[in-house]
Structures are given as structure tokens and as C-alpha cells.
Amino acid sequence: MREIMKILIITGKLAERKVKDAVKKYDFIDVHVANISVAAFLTPNLIIKEIKKLENKLGKKLKDIYDFVLVTGLIRHDLKNVEEETGIKCFKSTREASDIPILIENLDKIKLSTKEYADLQLLEIIRKKCEEEIKKAEEQELGEGDIKIGKLKVGDKFPMRVLGEIVHAPWLKEKELEEKIIYYLESGADMIDLGMVSNENNADKIKDMLKIARDLTDNPISVDTLNTKELIEAINLGADMILSVDAGNLDELIPYLKDSETAVVVLPTNYKTNYVPETIEGKIKSLEENIKKLIDAGIEKIVADPILEPINNAGCSFIESVIACREFKKRNKLPLFFGVGNVTELFDADSNGVNALLAAIGAEIGANILFTPEASAKCKFSIKELKIASKMMFLAKKRNSLPKDIGYNLINYKDKRFEEEITFNSYNIPIIKAEEDERQILDEGSFKIEIDRKNKEIVAIYFNKRREPVLIIRGKKPKEIYETAIRLNLIKKLDHASYFGRELAKAEIALRIGKKYNQDFDLFL
């Protein structure tokens, strides 16, 4: 009777080397190469044939040699029939050969499936471990320099907190504000910032806005303005934090802050006199002076904001502002505010990589709050990106490792490992150069495709020949939409079917990455 586990892996000819390299350190794993070039083309019937062929060669049933079979590749079929026909359990492996070792090391933690690849379960295991680490850290008591903003612990022992600003909050209708807050919370915001409007006094709207926010969440709510009347109203109404205090309004606010639980973000500026320090030492000196006045007045919940500057900024540069943040943190044991949005909103680049790098810089210099609006379209998903980056950097620092193979990543548009099966060079068959043909035979009707971003759905509106709307098909995935259209006999021409599928795929990509979708126009120019 076998006591040591043995596994057989079945793969195709093209993946043979990758699979064998991936499992070469395991002496209890054998690899069988099926008589097929691409593993993805394997079907249950072909696998059964391969198993029976191998059994004839060995003179034994595979179930007497191996505990189970793993099949590699992007196989679409359920492999349940394989065990029914051969008697040996057969499961799907990981999508990528390079991930097989991770699967092998975690066999005791997952349930192998005949339908689903093992990748998602492996990711869940890694993520669960990460979340447990973070949860354990959240249970720590406050240390030196740490504070509580509302019920949220902020300080060096905890992950960097993400503060999402709702720009021009007083201009939003109640429903719009609610939707924005819900979206920010779903994106992972630890705190919600109600951004006021420059050169306006909307103090009378703060009470209602705070109520709307607090009816939706227990997360801390801050009010962002330099208007002294608005700041006083926010303090009196019990806002969890105010942004911002500087030399110009500090003296007026101290009497109200003394007896409140409101945390205060302090700047090195005096906007009343248009003073903005433009050197590293100037930033630090002014900030320390403003903070000293607050401390002397008995105010303890202080967050320092040396002001992170945009790239290529006139006056104090981005790099100088980073150095100012770092030097201030070295000299002062206070929570540090890091205005990431000052950079991303003024930088024409996809936000995810910029946010990842800025969060990493923030972690190295000791930042505790990552602040961002999602004011421009290019910065959509910034809150979600910063939340992921915060977790990555917290775990990397805790484990004393690089922000790589952590369990979280911000690789959205490329791949960490690039593995493609290329077969076209192996076929000795005619090659036909593709050419467009502008001739089209019109179908009986047509579709207008749109995106419902609120419900995260693709919408296909069907029009008859008279251009009258007839019905709407809604769905999350192109497949369910085009299969519904075919089932309803709305598409009869091949070129229309091809066009419809292409446009649905474009809409799905646009919905997923937050890009604008216009039917008949390329997503990427």
C-alpha cells in the first residue's frame, strides 16, 4: 500500500519543458506529455484516451500508482467524466506552469476541482493570510505619536490610511453625495473628506453633509477648507478631522479646538498673507512653529502636512517636498499627511503606477495618511489603488521584504509572468494576409452599445430598420449579451455578429479599466 503521495501531470507538447522545469524538484510528480501540441485543446475524451494508453504501456491502472492526475492548460471542459471512466481522480491545475509549485505547496489548504482552475483558491489563501496579518496589526494599542481620528487608529504601527476627498461637496445634490461616499467606501477609503469650495462660505451646508456621510458609515469624516467660518462650524458639529490649519487661521481656531475631539491637519503656510515656503528648511520651520502653538494650547490630535508638491513645480520641487516630509518626520513623532493627489492629478499618466510609487515613497518616509481626490477621469480608481498599495507596503515593511509577491499587486495592464503558447510557426499551411472589405450586407436591425457604470453593466439597445428602439439587453459580460441576441434571433449576418462581438469586448475593457467608450472608435489611439 502506497504511503507517499504520487501525482501525474498531463500536459501538451509545447508546454512540456515549462511543466517539467516547474516540478523538477518534486520526486513524487511525474509528467506525461499527451499527443497534442497545445494543452488547452485537451478534452475529457482525449485525456481518457491518454490515460488508457499509459495504463496499457505500464501494465497497471493509474489509480494504483498515483493519487490523482493534474491537467495543465486553459481547458474549458469539466473533467468529471475522466474519473468515471478511468477510476482515477482528475483535476485542473493552475493556468500557468510556473504556478504549479505554489499549488503543490498548498495542496492541504485547497480543494482541487474538475471545473475551476486552482489559481483563485491559491490567491484566496495568500490574501487571507495577508488580511490576518493586517487584522492582527490593527489590534495593537496606540504607540508614541499615534492618534485616533474618530475610531480609526493612525500612526506608524498601522497601515497608511487612505483619505478620499469629495471635491466641491456643497455643490452636490444629496443623492449625488451619497453615491460618491458609497463609491469611495467600496473603493476602500478609510476616511471621507468633504471638500468645500474656494472663495465661498458654505458653513450652513456642513451639518447636512456630515449627517448624510454619518448615516452611511462609521468611518471618520473630515471637512476640507481654509475658510475659518466653515472650519469653526465643522469643529462645532464634531467633524472627526479638519483640513487645514495654518498660521493665517490658527489663532482663531484654537479656542474651538481646545475642547473638541477633532483632529487637525496643519500646513506650513499662511494663506492670509500668501506665504508659501519654497525651501525644505522653510517648510519644516514654519510647520514646526504652527504645530508648537497648537501643542502649547493643549491640542493633541495633530497631523502634519509639509505639502507634497507636483512634479516640476515652480518653487519647492517634488523631490524637495519629499525630503521635507522625510526630515520633518525624523524630527517629529507625529502622524504625517501625504497629499498624493497633488501629484497624480497634475501628471498625465495612468494613475495606478504613479499611486503605487507614491505610496511606496510615503511608506519609506513615514507617511500615515494618503490623501487623494478622484477629480479627473485619469485618476479614477485612485482610492482603490492607494488602498492596495498601502496594504502592499505595510506587509513589505512588516516582513522586511520588497513589495513583490506580497499577495496584493497593482499590475493592471500587463502581466507579472508573460507566458503565451505560440503555435503558428509550427504549421506548414498557407498564410493569407488579412484585408478589410468595406462591403457590408445590412442586418434587419442594429445595436447601440453603452456602459452603465453605476451598475457595472454593458447595455445593448436594439433598433429596428426604422431606427426605432425595440428592446435593451443588459449584462456584465459580452458572452451573455451576444448569446441572448442570437437566441432572440436579432443577429443574422456574420459581419454583424463579428462587429457586435468586437464592440462588446471594447465596452467590457472600457468598463473594467475606467476608460471612455465610444462605439465605432478605438479605445487606444
Curated annotation (Swiss-Prot):
GO terms for molecular function: dihydroneopterin aldolase activity; transferase activity. CDD domains: Pterin_binding (cd00423). GO terms for cellular component: cytoplasm; plasma membrane. It holds the Pfam family DUF6513. The keyword Nucleus does not apply. The chain crosses the membrane at residues 28-48, 353-373. The keyword Transmembrane helix applies. InterPro entries: DHP_synth-like, Dihydropt_synth, Dihydropteroate_synth-like_sf, DUF6513, Pterin-binding_dom, PterinBD-DUF4346. It comes from the Archaea. Residues 146-394 form the Pterin-binding domain. PROSITE patterns: PTERIN_BINDING. Its main location: membrane. It is found in: Cell membrane. GO terms for biological process: folic acid-containing compound biosynthetic process. It is a multi-pass membrane protein. Keywords: Cell membrane, Membrane, Transmembrane, Transmembrane helix. Unknown. Does not possess dihydropteroate synthase (DHPS) activity since it does not catalyze the condensation of 6-hydroxymethyl-7,8-dihydropterin pyrophosphate (DHPP) and 4-aminobenzoate to form 7,8-dihydropteroate. This is Uncharacterized protein MJ0107.
